[in-house]
Amino acid sequence: MIADKLFEKVEKNGVVCVGLDTSLDYIPEEFKSKFSNESDMLFAFNKEIIDATLDVSACFKVQIAYYEALGLKGLEAYKNTLSYLREKNALIIADIKRGDIAATAKMYAKAHFEGDFESDFITLNPYMGMDSIDPYLPYIEKNEKGVFVLVRTSNKGAEDIEYLEAGHGKKVYDVVGEKLNTLGKNYLGKHGYSSIGGVVGCTHQEEAKEMRDKLDTMPFLIPGYGAQGGTAKDVAAYLKNGNGGIVNSSRKILLAYKAMEDNKNFAECARKEAISMRDSIREAILK
């Protein structure tokens, strides 16, 4: 199961998930000047970041919107980035947040679990119901693939829907998490985690222990670290024995060179930030 590969990557490299949410204005001007087109520029920047952080991260999350916004040349950079990650045997999360059902969802599954855009995991939105997850299950069962489904997110607007009362003392996010955790038990790996994971923001620490205990076999994709205010202490509460999830950081890693005032060595700065993040979380876990 792909869940086992993720667990083992975390054991080896730590919990950091490097977010390749690469906006053109994140790229240093002097690096940009080497390229005549945006596709090559984006891919080359990503490649530098990947090479610098590969051995200090569990996986890479590539947010497709940053590439779609540039049209075909952006999608070419997206394709090339995924291809390079596969070449490096890195685990890939395609952050696509699809949420349709039936035949449309089958096409999304085919698009992102096969071919040019093949990834190991994708993100999904469960708002239309559990039948929006069903078309991805054959890939989970037979093709070593996995999904991370939105459960309780880190944005302020999450309270508009995810926190609504659903009866019996539960909120909407509780019900979503429980349904996914139950389904996920059909796809458990040898380390006790499922290939059906949940996106759980780390900006609500007061709920962390309860969620970790209830969603016992669900690996968490944890956004909100760094730029959104989440700390190492916040993150540690969502993990179990230092595993059971990965922690995404995009801007804080990609833009580390600005904080370190070293545009020329942006990739090395990204590596330093990833190591610092990994070590801070490890220290918080031990406390």
Swiss-Prot record:
HAMAP family: OMPdecase_type2. The active site is at residue 97. Transmembrane segments: none annotated. Pathway: Pyrimidine metabolism; UMP biosynthesis via de novo pathway; UMP from orotate: step 2/2. It catalyses: orotidine 5'-phosphate + H(+) = UMP + CO2. One of its GO terms (molecular function) is orotidine-5'-phosphate decarboxylase activity. Its EC number is 4.1.1.23. The lineage of its organism: Bacteria, Bacillati, Bacillota, Clostridia, Eubacteriales. Keywords: Decarboxylase, Lyase, Pyrimidine biosynthesis. PROSITE patterns: OMPDECASE. Belongs to the OMP decarboxylase family. Type 2 subfamily. It holds the Pfam family OMPdecase. One of its GO terms (biological process) is 'de novo' pyrimidine nucleobase biosynthetic process. This is Orotidine 5'-phosphate decarboxylase. The keyword Membrane does not apply. SUPFAM superfamilies: Ribulose-phoshate binding barrel. It is an enzyme of class 4 (lyase).
